[in-house]
C-alpha cells in the first residue's frame, strides 16, 4: 500500500483554474455596491491517479489561522467557522457570491474608515457531478474597516450563517471575524 501511494504522488500532475470577478457600482453619493463572484476547480491530468490531496479548497470563516503545510486554499465566507463548509480533506470545486454595501465614514490620508453590510453565499463540492451553483450556504452581516498606511487594512465583521455546517442540523448563528491586511 505505501509503495502504491509513493508512486502515485511521485509526480504531482494537476491543474487549478480560478475565476474572480469584482464590480464596484456607485449607488448614491458615497454609497458603493461591491458585487463579487468566484469559482475554482482542481483537476488531474491523469484520471487514473486521481486528484492530488494538496491545493484543495476549504470554504468558511475569515481565513486567519489557517497554518498548514498541504497548500490548502482557504475561501473566506463570513458567518461560519474557519474551513467548516468543506470536508476534512478539502474539496476540488467551489463557488462564492457576495454583495457588499460600503459607506465611508472618513477618507482622511492617515486613516480611511468605512462601514459595510454584506450578504454572501458559497459552497464546496467534491467534483462537477455534485456541483450545483444554487445549493449554497448563505450568510449576512455588518462590519467596519479602517485602513492606515502604517498598518494596512484592519477590520471586524459580524456575520450570521443561515444554514447548518456540515454534519449539523441547526443554523450556524453569529460569528465574529477579524480582518488583518486582506480584502474580503
Where are these regions (language model features)?
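C-terminal outer-membrane beta-barrel translocator/porin domains of Gram-negative envelope proteins
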Residues: 1-105, 117-118, 125-127, 166-169, ...
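Repeated loop/turn-to-beta-strand initiation elements of outer-membrane beta-barrel proteins
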Residues: 28-33, 106-109, 146-156
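Active/binding-pocket-proximal capping segment
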Residues: 37-41, 113-124, 133-137, 159-162
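C-terminal beta-signal and terminal closure region of outer-membrane beta-barrel proteins
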Residues: 60-69, 129-184
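Glycine-centered secondary-structure boundary/capping sites
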Residues: 61, 110-112
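Hydrophobic alpha-helical bundle architecture
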Residues: 100-108, 131-132, 145
Amino acid at each position: 500500500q505505501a509503495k502504491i501511494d509513493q508512486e502515485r504522488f511521485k509526480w504531482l500532475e494537476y491543474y487549478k483554474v480560478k475565476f474572480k470577478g469584482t464590480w464596484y457600482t456607485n449607488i448614491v453619493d458615497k454609497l458603493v455596491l461591491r458585487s463579487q463572484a468566484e469559482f475554482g476547480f482542481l483537476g488531474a491530468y491523469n484520471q487514473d491517479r486521481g486528484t492530488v490531496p494538496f491545493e484543495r479548497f476549504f470554504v468558511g470563516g475569515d481565513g486567519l489561522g489557517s497554518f498548514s503545510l498541504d497548500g490548502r486554499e482557504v475561501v473566506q465566507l463570513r458567518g461560519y467557522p474557519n474551513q467548516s463548509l468543506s470536508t476534512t480533506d478539502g474539496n476540488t470545486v467551489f463557488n462564492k457570491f457576495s454583495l457588499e454595501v460600503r459607506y465611508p465614514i472618513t477618507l482622511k490620508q492617515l486613516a480611511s474608515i468605512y462601514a459595510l453590510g454584506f450578504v454572501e453565499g458559497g459552497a464546496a463540492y467534491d467534483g462537477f457531478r455534485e456541483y450545483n451553483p444554487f445549493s449554497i450556504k448563505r450568510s449576512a452581516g455588518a462590519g467596519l474597516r479602517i485602513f492606515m498606511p502604517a498598518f494596512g487594512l484592519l477590520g471586524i465583521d459580524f456575520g450570521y450563517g443561515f444554514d447548518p455546517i456540515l454534519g449539523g442540523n441547526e443554523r450556524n448563528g453569529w460569528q465574529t471575524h477579524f480582518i488583518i491586511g486582506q480584502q474580503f
